[in-house]
């Protein structure tokens, strides 16, 4: 049985005389929501730098402290992605371009896929997560992506 939860939030109304673009920035708004989220999620800018990550997302992706990742490229070495072969090799550059957070930015569409994340130590198990990403827009242009994760 499917379960859907919805919530309502207040609509931001720009102050009189203030251009809507300045007051309402999607990345900034989403960064507040992501940093406070109980769900594992990450928000990245179009240049792939991490804008916000939830505590659960940081733990699930073996990223260390949430604040340490802010401003760092998502794939700077902290996030070690593996292929699904028996050899568990690290993903190559063309494969990395197809992971959901980056694919949502380049395609401007929803992206979904499984990711295998290398454990933090040799004995730690790898994590397999389902990633669902959506592009974040501003003035019709993609400025980042928001990704939610679920451990498989």
Description of each model-found segment:
Residues 2-10, 91-129, 143:
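Per-ARNT-Sim (PAS) sensory domains and their PAS-associated C-terminal
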Residues 45, 121, 137-138:
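Short, acidic, Ser/Thr-enriched surface-loop or helix-capping motifs
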Residues 131-133:
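Sensory input modules used in signal transduction
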Residues 4-19, 28-32, 37-107, 135, 140-152:
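PAS-family sensory domains
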């Amino acid at each position: 049985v499917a379960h859907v939860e919805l919530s309502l939030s207040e609509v931001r109304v720009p102050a009189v005389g203030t251009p809507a673009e300045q007051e309402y920035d999607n990345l900034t708004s989403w960064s507040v929501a992501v940093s406070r989220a109980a769900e594992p999620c990450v928000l990245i800018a179009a240049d792939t730098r991490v804008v916000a990550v939830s505590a659960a997302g940081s733990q699930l992706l073996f990223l260390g402290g949430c604040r340490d990742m802010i401003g760092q490229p998502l794939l700077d070495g902290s996030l070690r992605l593996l292929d699904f072969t028996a050899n568990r090799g690290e993903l190559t550059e063309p494969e990395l371009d197809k992971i959901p957070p980056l694919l949502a930015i380049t395609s401007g569409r929803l992206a979904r896929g499984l990711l295998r994340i290398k454990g933090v130590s040799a004995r730690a198990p790898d994590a397999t997560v389902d990633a669902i990403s959506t592009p974040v827009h501003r003035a019709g242009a993609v400025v980042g992506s928001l990704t939610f994760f679920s451990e498989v």
